[in-house]
């Protein structure tokens, strides 16, 4: 509607359409804009142009950043695979062995991939959620759906066949025996037969094609055939993607501290109690009008002792972050936990702080688990002790099944049972976890001084440091 020298806009929606449409051209600067309800859109032509420029800048800043490729990572890995194929050829590169005093052919291979849990699924092509989320058990994963999540139980089958708990002795597990055999990890040839016929078209557009769910609506075990299967030696490797102990320890620490009631919101909820009621397990924890405290939850007095012990601990410089900075003495809870903080808590501090606290059937398995994590984190591991370590961690998980509700047993808790097998194949944990890569990423981030050009800043900073090291190095 025209009113003198102004154009009156009837609705706010129309005003938004007029202004936003000018972002894509067609802006008419000869008219002034005035809203009938005296909004701030009333302006002369110069102010209107400034508003349009301001909205253009806001619109550009609101554009979503590039998303992670997810399962389409194979498209970006194509150049890497081509270089790996060049490193692995029949004749190899002749290299002189000074010790043997003879020449041999040198070839390079990709020994194992190291990723966190979501990236492991994208790289390997195996699903990391649902009923078959375990990368070792595959189709033999013991899982059930409770409380809107999958839980992974059945760790008794990893015990020796004649173990009293497995045979159903005593009152545990309702006296039922578990005669199942321990799942065996399939060989590379068997895994290749599982994925060789999968047809996947990469891309998130209309042309993309993924592996559909099964007849029951469950997530498929394999989402794609990984590009690394093109490598001729990939079938021979016993472990393709290692379990990242750093993230497993952090998730386990947070999960355990949540149930102890000293970090975040407690997971001892009525829904968790109802899961046990559905399974007919531990009737003493069934929900009532008054939800009684669980045996694994610290009381108010125990929390006082627990955090007083932690606040009094003094560690050497560089051993860990400031312990007083990660605990809140007022609320009696942990705060701002990082991966290394969880590593120090689980391997060193938690067994000390829990001495004399909690019932023995709860405290002893937790302490044994901390001892296990400390043992596998050493740089030197005796191969003869691996059998004992495997036995200890299985007994800890079985003891946890007798104490904690099913919601405690997420996939990260279940992966503990497979760590010793990977150590026997790949070596000590420090050789195949994420700590070295996270530290190096921290070094690269310090090179970024221009946030608009992070790649250029990293390249320039890394090159400058390399030149300085070359110049100051002794001849």
Could you describe each region identified by the protein language model?
Residues 365-370, 415, 429, 434:
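Conserved, folded interaction/cargo-binding domains in eukaryotic regulatory proteins
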Residues 63-79:
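Active-site beta-loop-alpha junctions of metal-dependent nucleic acid enzymes
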């Amino acid at each position: 509607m025209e009113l003198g020298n102004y154009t009156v806009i009837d609705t706010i929606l129309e005003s938004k359409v007029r202004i936003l449409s000018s972002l894509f051209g067609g802006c008419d600067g000869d008219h002034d804009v005035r809203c009938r309800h005296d909004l701030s859109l009333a302006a002369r032509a110069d102010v209107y142009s400034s508003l349009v420029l301001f909205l253009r800048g806001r619109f550009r800043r609101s554009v979503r950043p590039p998303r992670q490729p997810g399962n389409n990572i194979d498209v970006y890995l194509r150049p890497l695979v081509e270089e790996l194929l060049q490193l692995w050829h029949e004749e190899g590169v002749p290299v002189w062995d000074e010790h043997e005093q003879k020449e041999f052919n040198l070839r390079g291979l990709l020994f194992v991939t190291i990723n966190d849990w979501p990236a492991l699924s994208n790289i390997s092509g195996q699903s990391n959620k649902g009923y078959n989320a375990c990368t070792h058990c595959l189709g033999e994963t013991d899982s059930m759906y409770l409380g809107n999540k999958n839980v992974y139980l059945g760790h008794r089958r990893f015990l020796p066949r004649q173990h009293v708990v497995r045979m159903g002795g005593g009152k545990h597990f309702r006296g039922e025996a578990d005669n199942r055999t321990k799942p065996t990890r399939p060989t590379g040839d068997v895994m290749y037969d599982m994925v060789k016929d999968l047809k996947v078209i990469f891309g998130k557009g209309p042309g993309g094609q993924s592996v559909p769910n099964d007849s029951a609506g469950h997530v498929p075990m394999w989402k794609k055939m990984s590009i690394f299967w093109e490598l001729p030696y990939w079938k021979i490797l016993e472990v393709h993607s290692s379990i990242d102990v750093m993230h497993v320890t952090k998730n386990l620490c947070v999960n355990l501290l949540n149930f102890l009631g000293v970090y975040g919101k407690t997971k001892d909820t009525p829904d968790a109690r109802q899961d046990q009621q559905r399974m007919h397990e531990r009737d003493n924890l069934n929900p009532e009008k008054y939800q009684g405290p669980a045996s694994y939850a610290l009381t108010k007095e125990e929390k006082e002792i627990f955090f007083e012990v932690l606040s009094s601990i003094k560690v050497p410089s560089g051993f860990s972050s400031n312990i007083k900075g990660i605990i809140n003495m007022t609320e009696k809870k942990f705060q701002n936990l990082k991966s290394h903080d969880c590593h120090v808590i689980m391997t060193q501090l938690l067994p000390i702080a829990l001495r004399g606290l909690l019932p023995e059937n709860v405290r002893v398995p937790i302490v044994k688990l901390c001892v296990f994590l400390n043992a596998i984190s050493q740089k030197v591991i005796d191969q003869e002790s691996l059998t004992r370590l495997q036995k200890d961690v299985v007994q800890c998980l079985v003891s946890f099944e007798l104490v904690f509700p099913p919601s405690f047993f997420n996939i990260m808790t279940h992966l503990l049972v497979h760590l010793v097998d990977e150590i026997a194949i790949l070596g000590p944990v420090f050789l195949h976890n994420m700590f070295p890569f996270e530290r190096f990423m921290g070094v690269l981030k310090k090179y970024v001084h221009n946030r608009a050009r992070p790649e250029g800043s990293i390249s320039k900073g890394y090159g400058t440091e390399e030149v300085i090291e070359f110049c100051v190095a002794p001849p």
